[in-house]
Amino acid sequence: MKKILVAILAALFTQTFADTPEEWITRANKAIKTEIRASSNSIHSKYSLGSLQDASAILDSALERFPYRIDIWLGQVQLNGEMENCKAQARYFEKIHELLKTKKDKCELKGGQKIADADKLLEGEFTIAARQHFDKENDACYEMLARQMLKFLPNSVEALNAMSVVHLLQKNDSAIVYLEKAHKLNPSDCIVIHNIAEFYKRKGNQKKHEEYTMKEALICKQ
């Protein structure tokens, strides 16, 4: 009778504390809390730093057990973006890139989904992470991720455009080098065309500005 009771309790324990990637993700999500912040003219809610750090620690533990779950690595990128810790984001992106390059057959997303196009996945996640810093006018973090993105994806239009934005923000003429390469790779990319037009507008080159403004009107505003 005692053995049966122990077996039942063990089964219940296993069911309650199932050690799966999804269970770890749920724990991390539950750890995240919001707090009310007040300024001189507004009241708003924001994730508390302590809870984000707790969630990140939970995901680190999950990755020790499930190192090939790329969605958990990407969760760390997102959490550290909320904490504006771009150095940590860069470290996690480095690991993701390494895994996708050397162990792609073992890597998975949610539900065991395999990764068909690793470059496309990286491009999309880098773009989201970098854009978050751009929107917050955190130029140093934006530049860090843009440079890393280009290092890993040298022929990505998104990466080339991101680096052009870094140079545009610095009023550096090298921006056009990245824009021209991106335009050559994808002549119909509307963001690239717009940025080329903007570059020539800043340089006072009316002829080139009008040329690319017309291209933008023809290709992008149909």
Locate the predicted segments by residue.
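N-terminal leader/linker segments that initiate helical-solenoid repeat arrays
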Residues: 16-73, 91, 100-102
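Short coil turns that delineate tetratricopeptide repeat
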Residues: 67, 101, 154, 187, ...
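Terminal, low-structured helical/coil segments at or just beyond the last alpha-helical repeat
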Residues: 22, 27, 195-222
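Structural signature of tandem alpha-helical TPR/SEL1-like repeats
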Residues: 50-57, 84-92, 134-145, 169-181, ...
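Canonical positions in the second alpha-helix
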Residues: 62, 95-96, 148-149, 181-182, ...
